[in-house]
Regions:
Chain B
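Conserved catalytic motifs of ABC-family nucleotide-binding domains
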Residues: 151
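Conserved ABC ATPase signature
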Residues: 89, 130-137
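Conserved ABC ATPase "signature" region
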Residues: 97, 101, 108-126
Length: 372, 310
């Protein structure tokens, strides 16, 4: 009987174009849109080499050796162009360089706008001037001390990364998107309840007249829905990773586990709404879409700042929003080296799944109806 | 007794849908449940099938109490509900196979049963069609095939011909009789008296959840005082002659519309002969003339004072 119901449910659901659109095509289309819209987000915070025009009016080998250090290596700070003063002015005016360093007895910097690159140039020159002045003073007073001095910068803070991953803001949007896709699985849950509750559909009435335990039929049928949702989610992940080249880190096993848990919560959410809410299917569908989109919004799918606002102003909402729990589980998995935050999210999702499924069971187990 | 319901009471708030309804269906008969819309036919069926709760009464099927988990009873019951209940995503064959599979796990046996059911309802040429491609009549036939494919001993059909074209309706009615000949006991609900009169061996007329008459169609017609209805095509009849006609013995009402005079009589022998004699004696020129026996609608009308289709 399991094979019979399972196989036919697969057929029915896979041929349901509306269902497949909302649960698979729509998330993939949205992911494509996100990729186009947020493609440059990760690059805005990255550092590029600063182009500088160097005008040497007097030789200064000491300064030039320092500059050489700044332009060498795997991650150079500056890219120098040794030019004449008029050429330097042209390059600056055209925006090809961030500033002009003029080397004479004393160094000077000319910029024509303010910005991070110009600030770095200023700090560099200030620090050089400060160090050479200090060294000059010490050399004048006691050259021996200067010989013994260690010019390595003293750092009073220690860098301890919370993550092994590189920061990528757009990932947060994709996490919320995956969470939304899992919760669109709620349509499957709604369908399953509609198919087993004789007071909700004529097909369910027919099924209730068959010599078959209705909870078994419900379970077999729901397993078919769950299987399809998992396959759809795997296809979405494959699309994100292989086509859109989204890097979800190296914990792919846990990511898949999280999708399994999220899909379970999503389907049980649909069953919960279908069994608890009175009204026709359109009302329930509207409610499912509304609740999922609202949850996704609060989880930062449309504006990342909303997630932070919720964290600051109404932190309890983070835990009451299952879409956020799921998105945050992915986030925690990728960004944090410890699993505490991840486990809290997964536990929250499982609690929701138990509450949704338990409530659905209490309604679905009913064997007779007041009316059909 | 295949089916026995005693003293069923079902209330929806203040509305009494079934008012101490009792019925018995014997093995091998086609039992008709006739009543206007809202009379309680479908509610009675849903109670019998243990789909809905009822406030009072008990139901036995095949001599055993009916319950939602009486799976050994349910496997011998076939149900064709009023509304078409099939999957639009499955073909005709797949739909019948799916519902049959809920009763018959063995694939080989099922294959044969499904083929037989599809042939039986005349959908052999449509087996790969999806329901959306079928006309209303064909869809009804598919609905029937889904309910009977597992060869049940008791088949309950709840208004299976609503909104069906005459050709499909005849096919459905012939099919029901054939199923009965093959050994199935049938419970057939309808508000179409002609259908019930045509195929049912025993009929119960219900109204407002109560049984108001029960028996064979002849038994039911004997219960009322109304005799035959005589219709005469006349070419010129005066008001005075119509009045005289109405005053003849055993004539209850006379109405005239255009050239047609409709005469309703009480039960009596030779009513037609007496009417003809009167027409001749009055030298009334006439054309066609025919007489009809009372219908179940007349039975319903006399008992309740309203038309069956009101």
């Amino acid at each position: 009987m399991f094979r019979h119901i399972f196989a036919y449910r697969l057929k029915v659901l896979l041929r349901d174009k509306t269902m497949i659109f909302w649960t698979m095509i729509f998330p993939i289309a949205l992911a494509t849109f996100f990729n186009l819209a947020f493609g440059g987000l990760g690059e805005s915070g990255s550092f590029n080499v600063i182009d500088v025009a160097l005008v040497e009016t007097q030789p200064n080998p000491q300064f030039m050796s320092v500059l050489d250090m700044m332009t060498a290596g795997e991650t150079p700070l500056f890219a120098l162009q040794k030019v004449t003063a008029p050429r330097g002015e042209t390059l600056l005016a055209d925006g090809h360089v961030a500033g002009i360093i003029t080397v004479s007895e004393s160094m000077s910097l000319k910029v024509n706008q303010s910005g991070i690159r110009q600030s770095i140039l200023k700090v560099f020159l200030d620090r050089y001037a400060h160090t050479t002045r200090t060294a000059g003073r010490i050399a004048a007073e006691d050259p021996q001390v200067l010989m013994e001095m260690d010019f390595t910068p003293v750092v009073f803070t220690e860098e301890r990364p919370v993550s092994h991953a590189e920061m990528d803001i757009k990932l947060s949007y994709f996490y919320a998107l995956i969470a939304m896709a899992c919760f669109y699985g709620s349509f499957f849950g709604m369908e399953e309840v509609n198919l087993i509750q004789a007071n909700l559909s004529k097909r369910a009435a027919r099924l209730n007249m068959a010599p078959l335990h209705k909870l078994k039929a419900f379970l077999y049928s729901s397993l078919a829905s769950y299987s399809i949702l998992i396959v759809e989610m795997m296809l979405l992940m494959a699309y994100l990773v292989l086509i859109l080249k989204i890097d979800f880190g190296n914990q792919i096993g846990w990511v898949i586990f999280t999708i399994f848990v999220g899909s379970l919560t999503g389907i049980s959410f649909g069953g919960f709404i279908a069994s608890m809410v009175k009204g026709d299917e359109n009302v329930k569908t509207g409610l499912l879409i509304g609740a999922t989109m609202a949850g996704s919004f609060l989880a930062g799918m449309m504006f990342q700042n909303v997630k932070h606002l919720v964290q600051l102003k109404a932190p309890i909402l983070q835990y009451l929003n299952p879409v956020n729990l799921l998105a945050d589980a992915f986030y925690a998995l990728y960004f944090f080296n410890t699993c505490k935050r991840y486990l809290i999210n997964i536990a929250g999702l499982l609690v929701f799944a138990v509450v949704f499924a338990g409530s659905t069971y209490l309604v679905v187990r009913r064997r007779k109806y007041a009316s059909v | 007794m295949i089916l026995e319901a005693n003293n069923l009471v079902k209330r929806y708030g203040d509305l009494v849908a079934l008012d101490h309804l009792s019925l018995e269906v014997k093995k091998g008969e086609i039992f008709g449940l006739l009543g206007p819309n809202g009379s309680g036919k479908t509610t009675a069926i849903n109670c019998i099938l243990s789909l809905i709760k009822y406030d009072k009464g008990d139901i036995h099927v095949f001599g055993r109490p009916m319950a939602p988990d009486a799976y050994d009873l349910k496997k011998d019951i076939g149900v064709v509900m009023q509304d078409v209940a099939v999957f639009n995503e499955l073909t005709v064959y797949e739909n019948v196979d799916y519902f049959c599979g809920l009763y018959v796990p063995d694939k080989q046996t099922r294959k044969q049963l499904v083929e037989e059911a599809i042939d039986f309802v005349g959908l052999s040429d449509y087996r790969k069609f999806y329901p959306k491609k079928l006309s209303g009549g064909l869809l009804r036939r598919l609905n029937i095939a889904c309910g009977i494919a597992h060869k049940p001993k008791l088949i309950i059909l709840d208004e299976p011909t609503v909104a069906v074209d005459p050709q499909s309706r005849n096919r459905i009615l012939e099919g029901i009789v054939a199923l009965n000949r093959q050994g199935a006991t049938i419970v057939y609900t309808s508000h179409y008296m002609e259908e019930v009169e045509k195929i049912c061996s025993r009929i119960m007329i219900i109204d407002k959840g109560r049984s108001i008459a029960e028996g064979t169609k002849d038994d039911l017609k004997k219960m009322i005082s109304l005799g035959e209805k005589i219709t005469v095509e006349v070419f010129g009849i005066s008001e005075e002659q119509l009045e005289k006609l109405e005053n003849l013995p055993h004539i209850s009402t006379v109405t005239c519309e255009g050239n047609l005079v409709e005469i309703r009589s009480h039960k009596s022998k030779n009513n037609l002969e007496k009417v003809l004699e009167f027409i001749k004696s009055e030298n009334i020129s006439f054309g066609r003339i025919y007489s009809e026996l009372p219908t179940l609608n007349d039975v319903f009308l006399e008992i309740t004072g309203k038309e069956l289709r009101d």
